[in-house]
Regions:
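Short, non-transmembrane cytosolic segments of multipass membrane proteins
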Residues: 2-21, 98-115, 214-242, 343-344
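Terminal membrane-anchoring module of integral membrane proteins
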Residues: 2-59, 159, 235-411
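Short N-terminal secondary-structure initiator segments
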Residues: 31-41, 45, 114-142, 173-178, ...
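Helix-loop-helix junctions within predominantly alpha-helical proteins
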Residues: 56-110, 129-204, 223-238, 288-317, ...
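Generic structural signal for well-ordered, non-membrane alpha-helices
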Residues: 105, 125-132, 213-220, 254-257, ...
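Inner-leaflet juxtamembrane helices
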Residues: 106-127, 201-218, 318-346
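Alpha-helical membrane-embedding segments
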Residues: 117-125, 159-170, 211-224, 261, ...
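Loop-centered beta-sheet repeat module
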Residues: 199-220, 225, 246-259
Length: 411
């Protein structure tokens, strides 16, 4: 792929700077040992550079998974010790949150190692091929795609800033000695774990956003073809026009299958990471609810530490991040339903053209096979799942409140 012509007045801000966003994402991923993530490869890396980056990726991942957990397990009592038993309960919940991130990092590392070539061949390059196929397609679906990309980009960077502020605030307000140092180190470790898993989540989100854009463009092309078919008239060129429409419908059917395969392969390789993301969201919501309760009990914002406020904002942003990931899958499901409705509006081919009738039937059958994939064969990643997570977190929050009230009576 080549950079767009900057002299074209019709280019949007995204068209002019798209590859800069992708390069930023690639560098951001490489820093955290995710060399496999290259959104739009421009040129092949030299073999020594590629070997170095792969070795760095494995070394960085093993330090996160093996070395640092041993250090924090050794200082477990230091991390969770507190004079205030209610604060200690909050520390336990935060530790559980980081443990979920740690498990997600392990799954992500194993998935990246096993599917290293598949991620490039079955996702990245297949997406590039589809981008070329839809280059002359209607441009309207690009507007929401660009909006979601901007929103995701701003949200992720804002969450990074919030976490860095929280680390500095914890360092500034913490007590002197080993306790403060270990907790600051643990906060930095949790920040790196989040970045590690977020890289793959962003890549999966980008693939799903692209799938949604392609389905919308395909639906518009399909609707235009339906209108052309409805305008057919019994003239001498009728059979020729039917052959042209059959060819166009066959091309659209192949594109639909390619889009389905792209989403299916991406979901298959990232389903365990997405499951970890859902569990992290559950624990984050639980932490957020309990933090707000902690604030209300004190009845004064002046008594609430700055790191607690930052953590609350971060958990809210994390929930929004998970929601838009699920929302993308919800939109894909709705677009498939819209395409099925478009196919049902197709009129009976004139002169009962056999090939055109067959292509309509094949396309309808193809849409029946385009069912949204499930997480580990258990759950659909949609808004209902995010709502279920929020309700479950609130239920666990009630249990935590009961423990909190019990601790208040004892203290």
């Amino acid at each position: 792929m080549t950079d767009p012509d900057p002299d074209d007045d019709d280019l949007t801000f995204w068209d002019r700077h798209e590859f800069k966003f992708y390069q930023y994402g690639h560098v951001y991923a490489v820093i955290y040992g995710q060399v496999v993530i290259d959104y739009v490869p421009q040129k092949a890396l030299k073999r020594p550079v590629k070997v170095f980056l792969i070795c760095y990726s494995h070394l960085f991942s093993l330090v996160l998974i093996v070395v640092l957990p041993g250090y924090f397990c050794y200082h477990f009592r230091t991390l969770t010790d507190s004079v205030d038993p209610r604060l200690q309960l909050l520390l336990y919940v935060s530790f559980a949150n980081t443990a979920i991130k740690y498990a997600t990092v392990i799954v992500t590392y194993l998935a990246n190692t096993v599917h290293f070539e598949a991620i490039n061949q079955k996702c990245t390059y297949r997406r590039m091929h589809l981008e070329k196929e839809f280059k002359k397609a209607p441009k309207e679906p690009k507007i929401p795609f660009e909006f979601f990309m901007y929103f995701k980009f701003c949200l992720i960077n804002l969450m990074m800033i919030i976490q860095v502020c929280g680390i500095f605030a914890q360092y500034g307000e913490g007590e002197k000695g080993t306790v403060s140092q270990v907790r600051v180190h643990f906060s930095i470790y949790a920040f790196v774990l989040w970045n590690y898993t977020e890289n793959m989540a962003d890549y999966c989100y980008w693939i799903n956003a692209s799938v949604l854009k392609y389905y919308r463009q395909l639906n518009l092309q399909l609707d235009h073809l339906r209108q052309d078919m409805a305008n057919l008239k019994p003239t001498g060129m009728l059979l020729h026009r039917c052959c042209e429409l059959s060819d166009r419908l066959e091309v659209l059917r192949r594109r639909c299958q390619e889009i389905k395969d792209l989403q299916k392969e991406s979901f298959r390789m990232h389903q365990f990471q997405l499951m970890g993301l859902m569990l992290s969201t559950l624990i984050n919501n639980l932490t957020n609810f309990y933090t707000l309760f902690h604030m209300l009990v004190k009845q004064s914002l002046e008594d609430v530490s700055y790191p607690v406020l930052v953590g609350s904002f971060y958990a809210t942003g994390f929930y929004i991040d998970t929601y838009i990931v699920a929302l993308m899958n919800e939109h894909i499901k709705q677009e498939l339903e819209g395409m099925a409705l478009t196919m049902r509006r197709f009129a009976e081919p004139p002169e009962r053209d056999v090939r055109l009738t067959r292509e309509i039937e094949h396309f309808s059958l193809e849409l029946l096979n385009c069912q949204p994939p499930m997480l580990c064969g258990i759950l659909h990643l949609d808004r209902r799942l995010v709502y279920l997570i929020a309700v479950t977190a609130f239920s666990y929050f009630i249990t935590l409140v009961q423990f909190d009230l019990l601790l208040r009576k004892k203290s």
